[in-house]
Structures are given as C-alpha cells and as structure tokens.
C-alpha cells in the first residue's frame, strides 16, 4: 500500500486558535483508495521549516496534501515553501490573475494588491480552480508522486478535492 502524508499549515493550528478539522477529513477521504495515511502534521507559517517538512514528506510518501497558507496575507507562505522544497521558481500566471480580478469585480470591488501572490505557481504545478474563493490550489506530479495544495477554509477546498 502506498503512503500519504497530510500537512496542516498555519501557526493558528499549532496554538489551538483554529481547530484542524481539514487533516482528519482529508485522511478519511483517502480510505477508499490504496493509500495509507502514515503521517499528519501541523506546521507553522514559516517558509524554511515548512519547506523542510514538504521535502521530507515528498521523499517518503506517494501523495502529500497541504491544507492552508494559500491566502493573500504575508503569513500565507505555502507557495513559497513548496517552490523552495521542489527547487522551482514561482511565476505569475496572468490568466489566473485575471480570474482573481474578475472575482473581485463581480463583487463590485477592486482586487487588493496582496491577492496578486495567489496567481503565482511553480512551472510543474497545475491549477486547481477554486469556485468559492480567490486561493486556487495546485496539483504537482513529479517522479511518479503527487503533491496537492489546498486552501484552508473547508468550503473552498472541498469542491477542489
């Protein structure tokens, strides 16, 4: 049976300010598949420690799922950490930036500059469209392994998963 690991990203998870229900729900969703969830972990919103955990998890497991840290705030560093762990640069995707701008326009608002970072991805990532928010996810396949990045809010990641 192949291994899976799930990382809940967010300092608020470590301090109990937010209850990490995502990890358990994602783990339960993997039960019907030939994947054994071997490890779950909560990691702070810090690039270097998160990159290290991603690199180690990706070395051990066939599937690594990260939940959280894809928002527009300075502490949302999952993209940067995964780019560092996989040794790939972050690049702006103009089409996705346009979708995020359209999300705000549809609500009668201009997109804040901070949301621009949500349109950044590494070259090996495929976008997972977020029908309910501005944080798209990623699906990365490398060396026969998969890495999935999902936003933290359950109403956003569930339709993507």
Tell what function each PLM region has.
Residues 1-41, 45:
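Glycine-rich phosphate/diphosphate-binding loop of Rossmann-like nucleotide-binding domains
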Residues 9-11, 66-74, 151-152:
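Glycine-rich beta-strand-to-loop/alpha-helix junction loops that act as flexible
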Residues 39-41, 66, 149:
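Short catalytic-loop micro-motif centered on adjacent basic/acidic residues
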Residues 44-55:
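Structural motif
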Residues 49, 76-161:
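Proline/glycine-rich low-complexity loops and linkers
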Residues 61:
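An anion/phosphate-binding loop that grips the pyrophosphate of nucleotide cofactors and donors
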């Amino acid at each position: 049976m192949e291994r899976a690991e799930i990382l809940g990203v967010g300092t608020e998870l470590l301090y109990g300010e937010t209850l990490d229900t995502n990890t358990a729900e994602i783990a339960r969703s993997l039960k019907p598949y030939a994947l054994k969830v071997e490890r779950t972990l909560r990691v702070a919103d810090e690039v270097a420690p998160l990159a290290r955990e991603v690199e180690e998890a990706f070395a051990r497991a066939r599937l690594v799922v990260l939940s959280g840290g894809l928002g527009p705030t300075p502490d949302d560093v999952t993209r940067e950490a995964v780019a560092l762990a996989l040794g790939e640069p972050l690049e702006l995707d103009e089409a996705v930036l346009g979708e995020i701008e359209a999300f705000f326009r549809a609500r009668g608002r201009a997109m804040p500059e901070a949301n621009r970072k949500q349109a950044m991805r590494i070259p090996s990532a495929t976008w997972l469209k977020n029908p309910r928010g501005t944080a798209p996810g990623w699906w990365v396949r490398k060396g026969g392994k998969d890495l999935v990045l999902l936003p933290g809010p359950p109403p956003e990641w569930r339709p993507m998963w």
